[in-house]
UniProtKB/Swiss-Prot annotation:
Domain of life: Archaea
Originating organism: Thermococcus gammatolerans (strain DSM 15229 / JCM 11827 / EJ3)
Domain TRUD, first and last residues per copy: 158-378
TM region positions: none
Designated name of the protein: Probable tRNA pseudouridine synthase D
Family the entry assigns: Belongs to the pseudouridine synthase TruD family.
Keyword tRNA processing: yes
Any one GO MF annotation of this record: RNA binding
Pfam families recorded: TruD
Function, in words: Could be responsible for synthesis of pseudouridine from uracil-13 in transfer RNAs.
Active site: 83
Length: 415
């Protein structure tokens, strides 16, 4: 199953036909520019560089920079991963003593420019990202159809804030399934799926199929390609300890948490799709949890419940763009909705056979407290136009954690 088939279960909010087309035919068709938090420029212990990369995975280029600078990749800070098949600009921090070495580094399709001294950049140290995206292979009527879709979505309050396909895997759409197995304590089945699932189109698939059939760890270590380093880490640790649980805990923390995050994202997408079918997204109901919004940026840690008493007040705040209705990123400490929205949340959990306690019973590094996430996206500064012999060009800003591909999905209707 590829991501298109996977996403067919999630409803579109727009009912108008999409424009079709293709993205990322060229890396230059998808440009991402990070807007950092101003606080990263406070201090003198780290050197801040602007990293421009083309067709590079974020972690891969970070490790290459670290290798050439003679430092650990853990000493390089960055606010978030960016698309690989794109041209992206983001800020990274390195120890101040490594500034000159980093300035001298030359890597193909990578540029590094010293900006300032500051502090270590952590994940989440950004306001959001600016995008310039071209959709190719569209008809001349694409502009008018885009205009109709955007008008419809503005009337409905925005674009649905689905987690994009990057969260689940583009071809091996199994991250969320692995996450569910981990929540259920099925570490052996989670390992079998992570190591053995093959879609038939990727290097290493034959080795994966062999493991699926035999579960022979020694053979897998011989056959798995070196670039499947996390799979090999899992295999090595299992061989050493005889425990798939310990094997998962040996993975780097960001990789270890990908699976639980993917399952949380899947549950959120299920909730959002059901809400599109059954309940309003831009009209708060009694029992809803809303998040505060300032300058178009949602503050997900600032929430309050809708009650009979404050219902009209909250509705006005939502209309003015000062608050947004939220959905659940399930976790052991997440603030639950009540009323009809709360019943829908409970139905999602019951349908999956999962309780919130399961998120707490995970091994400590994997345990997830959960939080709220706004149901709608309102791209800031959205402009678009048709370029003859090229396609549709879009420019907009999105807050952190929001996916440009989810905006494009409503316009293209390609998945």
């Amino acid at each position: 199953m590829d991501y298109r088939e996977f996403f067919s279960q999630f409803r579109h909010l727009s009912e108008k036909p999409g424009i079709g087309g293709k993205i990322k035919i060229l890396p230059e068709d998808f440009v991402v520019i990070e807007d950092p938090l101003p606080q990263i420029f406070e201090g003198r212990k780290h050197a801040i560089f602007l990293l421009k990369k083309r067709n590079w995975d974020t972690m891969a280029v970070i490790k290459e920079i670290a290798k050439r600078a003679g430092i650990s990749h853990r000493d390089i800070g960055f606010a978030g991963t960016k698309d690989r098949h794109a041209v992206t600009y983001q800020y990274i921090s390195v120890p101040a003593g490594a500034k000159e070495k980093v300035e001298s580094i030359q890597i193909r399709d990578v540029e590094l420019r010293f900006v300032s001294y500051g502090r270590f950049i952590k994940l989440g140290h950004l306001l959001g990202n600016r995008f310039r995206i071209i959709i190719r292979d569209v008809e001349g009527s694409a502009f008018d159809r885009t205009k109709e879709i955007i008008r419809e979505l503005r009337e409905k309050g925005g674009f649905p804030n689905y987690f994009g396909y990057q969260r689940f895997g583009e071809r091996r759409v199994v991250n969320h399934l692995i996450g569910k197995l981990l929540l259920q304590g099925e570490f052996d089945e989670a390992a079998r799926l992570f190591l053995g699932y093959a879609d038939g189109s990727m290097e290493g698939d034959e080795a994966r199929r062999n493991f699926w059939e035999t579960e022979d760890v020694d053979r897998a270590l011989e056959e798995f390609p070196r670039f499947l380093r996390y799979e090999r880490t899992l295999l090595y640790t299992y061989k050493k300890t005889g425990s798939w649980k310990k094997a998962f805990l040996s993975l780097p923390l960001p990789i270890m948490r990908i699976f639980i995050h993917a399952y949380q994202s899947y549950l959120f997408n299920l909730y959002l799709s059901r809400r599109i079918e059954e309940l309003p997204l831009n009209e708060p109901l009694v029992g809803d949890i809303v998040v505060q919004v300032k300058g178009g940026i949602p503050y997900r840690d600032r929430t309050y419940r809708v009650t009979e008493t404050n219902l009209n007040f909250v509705r006005e705040k939502v209309k003015r763009g000062e608050a947004m209705v939220s959905g659940p990123l399930f976790g052991f400490a997440m603030r639950r909705a009540k009323g009809i929205p709360g019943e829908l949340e409970e139905e999602i959990l019951e349908g999956e056979g999962i309780t919130l306690d399961a998120f707490k019973k995970l091994p400590k590094p994997m345990a997830e407290p959960g939080r709220r996430r706004e149901l709608l996206i309102r791209p800031i500064g959205l402009t678009y136009g048709y370029l003859p012999e090229t396609g549709m060009c879009f420019r907009f800003f999105l807050p952190k954690g929001v996916y440009a591909t989810s905006v494009l999905r409503e316009i293209m209707k390609d998945h």
